[in-house]
A protein has these predicted regions:
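Active-site-proximal, Lys/Arg-enriched surface segment
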Residues: 1-48, 160-170
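An internal, acidic/charged active-site-proximal segment
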Residues: 45, 50-180
């Protein structure tokens, strides 16, 4: 979806796994992803005539190109888990996995917490209807914020010049700490 044109356009999305030591950043893995689209008559935003006019070459089933084609159609969350798993098999160690709000989901939380590593997942919450099990019951993020304000648990950081609060909760049967 193009936020400039306010409509869907043909394109692809890039998914990158990088490692940083605070000074340097190294790309470990990447994959390109596409979507079929919502209109069944215009798969990937193309008419059948446009799809048939595209270059096509039959390749060996075990070729790298076919591997990339399978990745192109794969879910980005599934692929990100595979990328992290592959990096761990290659001996890459990390303390934190920083992800976008799109990837802060139950599947990735389960994967990271099921590893026998001392690592943390840092990601942004979606401020939607997702419920987290807290001492006060099953609450969504806006309700948790209101509750923290009423309990006067919100603090101010002079150094960062912002207000913050946190609460321990449970999500996807895993203990998490939520910061606001």
């Amino acid at each position: 979806y193009s936020h400039v044109l306010h409509r869907s356009i043909l394109g692809f999305k890039g998914l990158f796994l990088c490692h940083t030591d605070g000074k340097t950043q190294t790309m470990l893995d990447f994959s390109l992803h596409g979507e079929e689209g919502k209109n069944p008559e215009k798969i990937q935003g193309l008419t059948s005539k446009q799809r048939n006019a595209r270059f096509c070459k039959v390749r060996d089933e075990k070729s790298v190109v076919n591997t990339r084609i399978r990745e192109y159609k794969q879910s980005k969350i599934e692929r990100s888990i595979e990328m992290v798993r592959h990096a761990m098999k290659k001996g890459i160690r990390f303390d934190y996995l920083l992800v976008d709000s799109w990837f802060t989901c139950a599947d990735l939380i389960r994967f990271i917490t099921s590893r026998h590593l001392e690592c943390h997942l840092i990601g942004m919450l979606k401020m939607g209807k997702t419920r987290y099990r807290t001492e006060a019951g099953n609450l969504n993020a806006p309700v948790i914020i209101d509750r923290l304000k009423k309990e006067k648990s919100v603090r101010y950081s002079r150094k960062l010049n912002c207000y913050y609060a946190h609460m321990d909760a449970e999500y996807a049967n895993r203990k998490i700490r939520i910061f606001f």
